[in-house]
Amino acid sequence: VNIIVFDTETIGLEKCFCYDIGYIVVNVESKNVLAKNEFIIEQVWNNKQLFETAYYCDKKELYVSKMRGRKAKLVNWGYAITQVIKDIKNFNVEGIYAYNSNFDTKVIDFNAEWYKTRNFLDYAPIFDIWGYTSELITSELANDYVEFCEKNALISESGNIQNNADSWGKFFNGLEWNEEHTALSDTEIESKILLYCFENGLTPQTEYKVKKCIESNSKQEKELIIKHNDKEIVYKYTSKREYKKNGWKIELKI
């Protein structure tokens, strides 16, 4: 079974002009990468005023380096989409995957409509990797990941195991790893996450719903510093956030 994993970087959330799209075609059984590309979209890149509104516009030098090193290509939107469609057809891709696919679907639909091009999402069904990781964690098929998160304080504000690409990347690559937030780099970690889900019993081309992750059993040690009369009193405590009907209640143990 061949699948494609992709990611996009955009100017904003509403008028989501895409300036970076990356994708990987991979065989599920062998894990061999059959094709991969990263395209910088010239309609946005060459519009300096527009590109500078992007949240990650400070990565411009990184993109310049990628293009100089021929790791990314500056192309127009139509060329990028045509190439994705060619690879979907050439490799008989059976499923398209993205992390938080609702957003990436919105991006592809918006840009295809804006530029009046074909839409590669018309050529295979799309599935959400976030749904896969939710299923893996809540069905207790990823206990090693859960233990890693609890050990390293990768816990959400609501006290649940974190379930995002950055935390999964740290699980695979170490705590020093940080998500690059460029399309191909993020696609590489997201394809690794997806293959891990398959290895641990989840089925390709299946729609798993995104759901709340399990609550962490660990209580994180924190410090409360009280300053009075030029003196500091430091209390060390553990806390666990509990949801109550009237809002959040913080449980302190000193």
Where are these regions (language model features)?
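Active-site-proximal helix-loop-helix substrate-binding element of RNase H-like nuclease domains
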Residues: 43-68, 130-187
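Ser/Thr-centric signal marking residues that sit
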Residues: 8-11, 129, 133
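Acidic, low-complexity, intrinsically disordered interaction modules
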Residues: 213-234, 238
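Acidic, Mg2+-coordinating catalytic module of metal-dependent nucleases/exonucleases
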Residues: 92-102, 106-107, 111-112, 149-217
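Short, polar/flexible loop-turn hinges at active-site or ligand-entry regions and domain interfaces
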Residues: 67-73, 115-121, 175-179
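A short, charged, amphipathic alpha-helix used as a generic interaction element across diverse proteins
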Residues: 236-254
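Substrate-recognition/cap helix-loop segment adjacent to the acidic, metal-dependent catalytic center
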Residues: 103-127
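Conserved non-catalytic scaffold segment of RNase H-like nuclease domains
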Residues: 2-111
